[in-house]
Amino acid sequence: MLLKELSSLASPLSQPQVEKLKQLTAELNAVQLAWVSGYLAATANASGNLAQLAPVSDAQAAQTVTILYGSQTGNGRGIAKALAEKAKAQGYSVNLASMGEYNVRQLKQETLLLLVVSTHGEGEAPDDAIELHKFLASKRAPQLNNLHYSVLALGDSSYEFFCQTGKDFDARLSALGAKALLPLVECDVDYEAAAGQWHADVLSAVKPLIQTTANVVALNDTSSALAASESEFTKQNPYSAEVLVSQKITGRGSDRDVRHVEIDLGESGLRYEVGDALGVWFSNNETLVDEILAGLGLAADTKVTVANESISLKQALIEKKELTQLYPGLVKAWAELSASPELLALSEDKEQVRQFILHHQFADLVANYQLKADANLDANKLVELLRPLTPRLYSIASSQSEVDTEVHLTVALVEDEHQGQARFGGASHFLASAEEGAEVKVYVEPNKHFRLPEDPQTPVIMIGPGTGVAPFRAFMQERVAQGAEGDSWLFFGNPHFEQDFLYQTEWQQYLKNGDLTRIDVAFSRDQAHKIYVQHRIKEQGQTLWQWLQNGAHLYICGDAERMAKDVHQALLGVAVEFGGLSSEAAEEYFETLRSHKRYQKDVY
């Protein structure tokens, strides 16, 4: 029966091949058929060419759940992959792909579409979702009256444009006539429970609309990042690594504490590419936890339940709960618990909340806004109020071509002062305080959107002020190992030359050896008027434009809030002044570079 259906569908097999397949399968028992099925699936997966399959026919599309993900980090990919596996287990035929690898012309043939998408920057689509996002917003987007869909949006509520890209997809699909299986699901940084519930709900919603095909399941995973060779060590199962070095690399007179951290990956087998990030799990500072407990009058040894585990309240606050990053929901909840008129008024103003959380931590709420008498905040209610601790991502500052089983980071200690009280970033303080031999739980977070050119002859322009220089240290190590002959140009900036020139001797050695073609620096406080990297870009605009015309790849790493925007504006100015482009054409020019992977950003 199945082979008869195969010959009538848009099969990639010729009729003689179908006949041969019939002859072979007729001679096999059930066990042998199962073995052949697995063998063929593995062979197809290993070929790496699944993305090139011809579009499915309408008959096939009606039997297929298409799951697309767009995510700057691996969170969206992980959620989508887990959903695909659950759908497969229930007998559904599944097409799983990154939005960046999806053929938008296939959209009008889809009948069941499940999207997982994050939001990047100020409400922007992540890199691999940009094309689909633009297509749906364009006049080319078709009517989708036959489509049922659901969107899971990932975001961080501490940012203004929370889950904006997911909202965009949901609104646009609805406007094009598609029918929502479920209301839009918006997930904060503690997304696991909500994502798991969405898995269950959306598969239940899909069930009446599709026939299961348990014997013919095609999991078309077009992402190499989901290969079977993935490390066993993940965000959920990190590797316990050893800290080898945590060395301050800013001068004694610097107002910044930046550390060069070296971590031993030992025999973990963890591999990373230059451009990837390292996920770091950390523990909250014990002194900070003691301050919070004292402020709330709660006993440290009180038993609480976290993720079905009974532990002491103090252990929960040190190991399990987020204390150093506020978010709007917590500010609003604390305003109600404290009944503070000041905090209640502030919590209703999004911009005021956004500014407040930049310079306050949970301990500041406890210290400055006392609970009202009937708040009844006991130990278990406290741990329910606080969201789970999440790892921090750091751009990797090394290449395994040079450091082998080590991984290097460039970590700026996050430090703020409020009413005379110093507050530190959770992960940065943990790493800065780590002594040689200390244990840290880590995993590799791939970043396929920040990669060196495949051809080592290609010139590269690297713009990385402050700790944004980290991945470019890795780039240079990799280029030297490759014997790259392509030119390389670094723009670096920090407050002071004598105190803040990160990895100065390494850059000088690269210049001396001819591995680094040129470096332009901007030390903002070494003269009366402030000079930043964007000023150096403008000064060197003619040369920079010539490099771009010669095929250079352009990279930016560092602060997304100000630096990346200012640098982008400077680049637009270069295109206008030295390329003779209009403002609109300049934007289109850099958008074309981005789509060809010649303009890449790692900003945060």
From Swiss-Prot:
Which is one GO molecular function term here? flavin adenine dinucleotide binding
Chain sites annotated for binding FAD: 324, 358, 392-395, 410-412, 425-428, 604
Q: Catalysed reaction(s)?
A: hydrogen sulfide + 3 NADP(+) + 3 H2O = sulfite + 3 NADPH + 4 H(+)
Q: Which UniProt keywords apply?
A: Amino-acid biosynthesis, Cysteine biosynthesis, Electron transport, FAD, Flavoprotein, FMN, NADP, Oxidoreductase, Transport
Cite the annotated pathway.
Sulfur metabolism; hydrogen sulfide biosynthesis; hydrogen sulfide from sulfite (NADPH route): step 1/1
User: Is Cell membrane one of the keywords UniProt gives this record?
Assistant: no
Q: Which InterPro entries match?
A: CysJ, CysJ-like_FAD-binding, CysJ_Proteobact, FAD-bd_FR_type, Flavdoxin-like, Flavodoxin/NO_synth, Flavoprot_Pyr_Nucl_cyt_Rdtase, Flavoprotein-like_sf
Q: State the Gene Ontology BP annotations.
A: cysteine biosynthetic process; hydrogen sulfide biosynthetic process; sulfate assimilation
Which positions bind FMN? 71-76, 118-121, 154-163
* GO-annotated cellular components: cytosol
Which cofactors are required for activity? FAD; FMN
Question: Does the entry feature the keyword Protease, yes or no?
Answer: no
Q: What is its EC number?
A: 1.8.1.2
User: What residues does NADP(+) bind to?
Assistant: 524-525, 530-534, 566
How is the cofactor bound here?
Answer: Binds 1 FAD per subunit. Binds 1 FMN per subunit.
Query: Which residue ranges does the record assign to the Flavodoxin-like domain?
Result: 65-203
Q: Which Pfam families match?
A: FAD_binding_1, Flavodoxin_1, NAD_binding_1
Domain FAD-binding FR-type span(s) in chain numbering? 236-453
Q: How the protein assembles, per its UniProt entry? A: Alpha(8)-beta(8). The alpha component is a flavoprotein, the beta component is a hemoprotein.
**Family the UniProt entry places it in:** Belongs to the NADPH-dependent sulphite reductase flavoprotein subunit CysJ family.
Q: What does this protein do?
A: Component of the sulfite reductase complex that catalyzes the 6-electron reduction of sulfite to sulfide. This is one of several activities required for the biosynthesis of L-cysteine from sulfate. The flavoprotein component catalyzes the electron flow from NADPH -> FAD -> FMN to the hemoprotein component.
- Protein name, per record: Sulfite reductase [NADPH] flavoprotein alpha-component
The primary gene name is cysJ
